[in-house]
Swiss-Prot record:
UniProt protein name: Probable drug/proton antiporter YHK8
Organism, as annotated: Saccharomyces cerevisiae (strain ATCC 204508 / S288c) (Baker's yeast)
Membrane topology, as annotated: Multi-pass membrane protein
Primary location class: membrane
Gene name for this UniProt entry: YHK8
Gene Ontology CC entries for this record: cell periphery; plasma membrane
Membrane side Extracellular: residue ranges: 96-111, 163-170, 222-227, 329-342, 408-412, 469-477
Signal peptide annotation: none
Bilayer-spanning residue ranges: 75-95, 112-132, 142-162, 171-191, 201-221, 228-248, 308-328, 343-363, 387-407, 413-433, 448-468, 478-498
Amino acid sequence: MVAEFQIASAQSSALTSTEEEHCSINSDKAAKLDLELTSERKNDGKQSHEVTFNEDIADPEDIARHMSTARRYYISSLITFTSMVITMISSSWTLPSTHIIEHFHISHEVSTLGITLYVFGLGIGPLFLSPLSELYGRRITFLYALTLSIIWQCLTIWSKTITGVMFGRFLSGFFGSAFLSVAGGAIADIFDKDQIGIPMAIYTTSAFLGPSLGPIIGGALYHQSYKWTFITLLITSGCCLVMIIFTIPETYKPMLLIRKAKRLRKEKNDQRYYAVLEVTREQTSLLSAIFLSTKRPFGLLLRDRMMGVLCFYTGLELAIIYLYFVAFPYVFKKLYNFGPMEIACSYIGIMVGMILSAPTCLLFQKTFEWRVKRNNGVKTPEMRFEPLFYGAFLTPVGLFIFAFTCYKHVHWIAPIIGSAIFGSGVYFVFTGVFAYTVDAYRRYAASGMACNTFVRCIMAGVFPLFGLQMYKSMGVNWAGFLLAMVTVAMIPVPFLFTKYGARLRAKSPYAWDD
């Protein structure tokens, strides 16, 4: 299930074309070149030929067919690790912020912008970087985006003004977001559909684990200069960039077809061979592609009530996690006198909850297939809500446990257990919402996911701005109770959508109607 929504999110685009009748060239040389004529078009009165890959004979450009399983997993592992580093940077600000406040003589509220602006960048960046990958390929997008992210990380580290630091945080998140929006498609490029479940599940989980690991880096280096936390992640990002430069090839099929078309034009001395992406580039500018990629997600958000509710739901879950990045240091230092490293390790509970929940995606997929079979082979998007049924209850349960076990006379492991249950619930909520979004919106799945990412990151960036003040003014227990009650209000969502989903989809201008 996790694999399916990620594949659809990464690969749905305006560049997809329908298959047409295959033709072949009647010559031995053409057979060796493995030319597949899948469509014909008229250009200046001459017949032109669109090239594609033949399933029977491997083209040299069709690199996915030549890759060993080990190399596929190496590429997906490197992309996954880089994605995790990008998300670690978002929360690594948590503990060094104390030193940043002292160094720049700023308030806690201003310091919190270091988290907020980075997460804003993660939410806004995909709207601009995804079209870049669809026109120019995965590899060049990764290289330029990670290089620019590293450059802006340098500004964050060595800027002499807090304005420069914040500007660097936003732009490093903006460009780093390519590994959250494009990476899933790159992994889908090199694995067959029946093999992609495990690598995609690992990739998806890593994006959630990164924020939990970030504070651990900050805690380990807390007694050093605040810069060393970010220098460590800068060096790690640089190592990832070097490895990507030398070991990650282009995987985007439309780009590989351009290479094949160029080879055929050169070898056959015939300029009539073309790839669809070449035509798309001629007819679509990068600016127009960016405009379309930003217009449709906002249309979905404003005109579709289902999308608005689902975006708010996932945004709320992620926002609470990021609120904890300012709340945990206050709670565990005040109640249990935790030091920096102990505070950093307190986030492991959320991480453990997500890790334990990840394998269930295979079980939910089996359950989905059973439901389809039971329904005479007819599947509906609402069948994807099963993980959300569990997540809807686990998230408030975890928050209630955390809220009412935060006492000095209660062992610190109790609220950590509550955070683990909450983390598990968050994973189920995201799995159910993402799978439903892809299945219900189909043609507009990529726009739906972009819309969800934008709302999610905006909410996650806003909540830390008032989190500490809320815990100080309301008290640890009542602030936690308030968060739990907000998630309780969301419990009916999957049940109402399961009952009325078909009716709501029929009224939606974007959703798939039965």
